[in-house]
Swiss-Prot record:
One of its GO terms (molecular function) is rRNA binding. Residues 49-78 are annotated as: Disordered. The gene is rplD. It holds the Pfam family Ribosomal_L4. Part of the 50S ribosomal subunit. One of the primary rRNA binding proteins, this protein initially binds near the 5'-end of the 23S rRNA. It is important during the early stages of 50S assembly. It makes multiple contacts with different domains of the 23S rRNA in the assembled 50S subunit and ribosome. It comes from Enterococcus faecalis (strain ATCC 700802 / V583). This is Large ribosomal subunit protein uL4. Keywords: Ribonucleoprotein, Ribosomal protein, RNA-binding, rRNA-binding. The keyword Amino-acid biosynthesis does not apply.
Amino acid sequence: MPNVALFKQDGTQNGEITLNEEIFGIEPNESVVYDAIIMQRASLRQGTHAVKNRSAVRGGGRKPWRQKGTGRARQGSIRSPQWRGGGVVFGPTPRSYSYKFPKKVRRLAMKSVLSDKVAENNLVAVEGLSFDAPKTKEFKQVLANLSIDTKVLVVLENGNDFAALSARNLPNVSVVTSDNVSVLDVVSANKVLATQTALTQIEEVLA
C-alpha cells in the first residue's frame, strides 16, 4: 500500500496517509495515458474551420460563354473550382473532433498518472487548505512552506472557494476540484498538491 506524508499548511508533517493501491500503486500504462491525452486534446479543438464550396460562393450563375464555337474550353460557371475566386473542393467544414474511450480505459489512464506521481514522490498531501478570505499572498506562503517552487496542480474538494480563488492568479499554479481533474491536468504539472478530502473523493470515484 503506498504511503504519502501528510502535511499541514505551515509545512510541518503530521504523519502519513495510506492510499488505495489499486488507484495510486499500479504499474502505469503509458500507451493508455498517451491515448487519453490525445483524446482530451482533440476535444479541446474548436472545429470552426470552414471554406466556401461552389454553391456558397457569390455569383457564377450565368454561363460565361456559349458551349460551342468559341474554341475555348467549355465552362459552366466562373465559380467552378478551377477558376480564380471559385469554390473550394473538399475543403474543411465545421465539425467536432471529440470522441470518447470506454469508462474503464479512462479510469485506467487516470490511475496510471496518479500512480506515477506517487512513485516519483511528486504527490503532496495536505490536511486541508482553509482561508478566511481569498488571499493569494497566503497561498503563495503555503507553497513556500511545502517547498513547492515548480509547476503544480492543486486538487481541492468541492466548496473550497476561498482556496481556489487564492491560488488561481499565481503563475505555474492550476486549480481543479476532485471531480474535474483530468489526465492532461496531472501530466502537465510537475507536482500535485491535494487535500486529504480531495484524495478520498478521487478514491471513491475511481474505486
